[in-house]
Amino acid sequence: MQVDLLSSAQSAHALHLFHQHSPLVHCMTNDVVQTFTANTLLALGASPAMVIETEEASHFAAIASALLINVGTLTQPRAQAMSAAVEQATRSQTPWTLDPVAVGALDYRRRFCVELLSHKPTAIRGNASEIMALAGVANGGRGVDTTDAAANAIPAAQTLARETGAIVVVTGEVDYVTDGRRTVGIHGGDPLMTKVVGTGCALSAVVAACCALPGDTLENIASACHWMKQAGERAVARSEGPGSFVPHFLDALWQLTQEVQA
């Protein structure tokens, strides 16, 4: 199985496009991570909007550059709003991304996410256990935590990509991005990133934004993984622990955008 690597030039080009286009991202995400997700998008130059009311969500999905569906704090009313937004995004050809949080551990959200797959997401981002569960390979995971290595989920991710037409992102010590034919691996990051709530969810929002960019969508999404890992490495070098990591991480994202504009 061939796994390609992303070049720094590809990553820099995608970040330049990101800053240039400043996607408006409709984030229907979980309650725990909304502020961090919004700040991550802002630091990179995107515009976040957290619209969750059913009538508003359906309308906003038509005008946003991209839509994120994150089921981390799923409720029945929220599921209805998400379904309405996805249906409108499909009609309006708005790219949308699914983050199937804890789908391997909880049956209600697994059924809901499987239903959403019929609307053909542009991208799917999850950890190894989530991707394997969504692909029907195995149930598992410890809530939002993975119990599988990312590399073990590559075959499931490739199958899921081929079946849905989505670009699938499996995150872990190494991130893997695949469209079912090409697979790109992104190294880097730091274990401390797993001790801060929302780094994966924020990545899903950046992935959603990248789906709205021109050019090679797989490379743009792989670049999103690279930016987050780069920023994580820089932040860890300046941090004393999870508490001081977050502001340094946001600063590092901002600095990355400034460097590609120089």
UniProtKB/Swiss-Prot annotation:
Amino-acid positions noted as binding substrate in the UniProt annotation, renumbered to this chain: 50, 198
Lineage of the species this protein comes from: Bacteria, Pseudomonadati, Pseudomonadota, Gammaproteobacteria, Enterobacterales
UniProt GO BP: thiamine biosynthetic process; thiamine diphosphate biosynthetic process
Record EC number: 2.7.1.50
Pathway(s) served: Cofactor biosynthesis; thiamine diphosphate biosynthesis; 4-methyl-5-(2-phosphoethyl)-thiazole from 5-(2-hydroxyethyl)-4-methylthiazole: step 1/1
Family per record: Belongs to the Thz kinase family.
Role description: Catalyzes the phosphorylation of the hydroxyl group of 4-methyl-5-beta-hydroxyethylthiazole (THZ).
Keywords: ATP-binding, Kinase, Magnesium, Metal-binding, Nucleotide-binding, Thiamine biosynthesis, Transferase
Pfam families reported in the protein's UniProt record: HK
Gene that this sequence comes from: thiM
Native source organism of the sequence: Escherichia coli O6:K15:H31 (strain 536 / UPEC)
Gene3D superfamilies according to UniProt: 3.40.1190.20
Protein name: Hydroxyethylthiazole kinase
Cofactor: Mg(2+)
